[in-house]
């Protein structure tokens, strides 16, 4: 059962306080401990999981200060970051689904799943999840890295993009790589996936080998793109990200070439 409840003050665990895709990080980290320690008694909370044997609670509220982007804890423990991402996405889902998009009546939270229900027209809404592909591309002992327009700060990463309607994951990889870098790839293989709450993506990761073409990056998407020798890389994404894993997996392949 996924029932909201009013906090009495005796509850203990991790506290995700979120509003408009931002999260409360007092002292720069997720609050942990008794509800009274964080003055949360009387708030309405929803249990959304467990971490290290402790409940994870979601409270949808804007705090006076220390409301920041979830990106601030990307490099923290992967499991905890994933739960925090779930909390932020659920908070935004419930905030944006207060009324039915079909009939305009008030929505109600399901107690058996993450969903909103309309008791008037019986419509049911679920959190939106956007499928994305991300791919590490190797050319001998080099890896293709790009600086994205939305990655200001000098970080270089692998290519990625959203899957379009009626498109397979494999087709999406081939299309995105061609659109963003003008090269063709081969030997495409699936690696892993990672929920990515910016804002509500599911990243599906692949590795591929270079086939043909010269890099010509799309200036609408990328600031630059180039081949980098595996032991002379620029600033890359932090640990616990699927992009970092693809880069590290490609480095291993380069060393074994």
From Swiss-Prot:
Annotated cofactor note: Divalent metal cations. Mg(2+) or Mn(2+).
Binding site for a divalent metal cation 1: 160, 180, 221
Positions that bind a divalent metal cation 3: 176, 180, 221
Keywords of the record: Hydrolase, Magnesium, Manganese, Metal-binding, NAD, Zinc
An annotated GO cellular component: cytosol
Catalytic activity, as annotated: a 5'-end NAD(+)-phospho-ribonucleoside in mRNA + H2O = a 5'-end phospho-adenosine-phospho-ribonucleoside in mRNA + beta-nicotinamide D-ribonucleotide + 2 H(+); NAD(+) + H2O = beta-nicotinamide D-ribonucleotide + AMP + 2 H(+); NADH + H2O = reduced beta-nicotinamide D-ribonucleotide + AMP + 2 H(+)
Binding site for substrate: 27, 71, 113, 126, 194-201, 243
Span(s) of short sequence motif Nudix box: 161-182
PROSITE patterns: NUDIX, NUDIX_BOX
Entries under CDD domains matching the protein: NUDIX_NADH_pyrophosphatase_Nudt13
Binding site for Zn(2+): 100, 103, 118, 121
Gene Ontology BP term (one): NADP catabolic process
Pfam family, one: NUDIX
GO molecular function: magnesium ion binding; manganese ion binding; NAD+ diphosphatase activity; NADH pyrophosphatase activity; RNA NAD-cap (NMN-forming) hydrolase activity; zinc ion binding
UniProt KW Amino-acid biosynthesis keyword: no
SUPFAM superfamilies: Nudix (SSF55811)
InterPro entries reported in the protein's UniProt record: NAD-cap_RNA_hydrolase_NudC (IPR050241), NudC-like_C (IPR049734), NUDIX_hydrolase-like_dom_sf (IPR015797), NUDIX_hydrolase_CS (IPR020084), NUDIX_hydrolase_dom (IPR000086), RNA_Hydrolase_NudC (IPR022925), Znr_NADH_PPase (IPR015376)
Residues that bind a divalent metal cation 2: 176
Cofactor: Mg(2+); Mn(2+); Zn(2+)
Top-rank taxon, per record: Bacteria
Alphabetical list of NCBIfam families matching this protein: PRK00241.1
Function according to Swiss-Prot or TrEMBL: mRNA decapping enzyme that specifically removes the nicotinamide adenine dinucleotide (NAD) cap from a subset of mRNAs by hydrolyzing the diphosphate linkage to produce nicotinamide mononucleotide (NMN) and 5' monophosphate mRNA. The NAD-cap is present at the 5'-end of some mRNAs and stabilizes RNA against 5'-processing. Has preference for mRNAs with a 5'-end purine. Catalyzes the hydrolysis of a broad range of dinucleotide pyrophosphates.
Entry protein name: NAD-capped RNA hydrolase NudC
Protein's organism: Photorhabdus laumondii subsp. laumondii (strain DSM 15139 / CIP 105565 / TT01) (Photorhabdus luminescens subsp. laumondii)
């Amino acid at each position: 059962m996924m029932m909201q409840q009013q906090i009495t003050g005796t509850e203990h665990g991790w506290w995700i306080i979120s509003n408009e895709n931002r999260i409360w990080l007092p002292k720069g980290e997720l609050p942990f401990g008794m509800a009274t320690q964080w003055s949360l008694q009387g708030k309405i909370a929803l249990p959304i999981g467990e971490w290290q044997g402790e409940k994870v609670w979601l409270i949808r509220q804007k705090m006076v200060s220390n409301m920041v982007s979830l990106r601030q804890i990307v490099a923290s423990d992967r499991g905890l970051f994933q739960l925090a991402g779930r909390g932020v996405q659920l908070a935004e889902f419930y905030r944006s689904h207060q009324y039915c998009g079909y009939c305009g009546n008030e929505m109600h939270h399901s107690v058996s799943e993450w969903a909103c229900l309309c008791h008037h027209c019986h419509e049911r809404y679920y959190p939106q999840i956007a499928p994305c592909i991300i791919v590490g591309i190797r050319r001998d002992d080099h890896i293709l890295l790009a600086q994205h327009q939305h990655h200001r700060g000098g970080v270089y990463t692998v290519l990625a993009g959203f899957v379009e309607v009626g498109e397979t994951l494999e087709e999406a990889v081939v299309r995105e790589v061609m659109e963003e870098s003008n090269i063709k790839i081969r030997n495409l293989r699936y690696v892993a996936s990672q929920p990515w709450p910016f804002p509500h993506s599911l990243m599906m990761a692949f590795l591929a080998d270079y086939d043909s073409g010269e890099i010509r990056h799309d200036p609408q998407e990328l600031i630059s793109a180039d081949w980098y020798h595996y032991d002379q890389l620029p600033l890359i994404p932090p640990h616990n990200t699927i992009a970092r894993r693809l880069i590290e997996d490609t480095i291993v392949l380069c060393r074994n070439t």
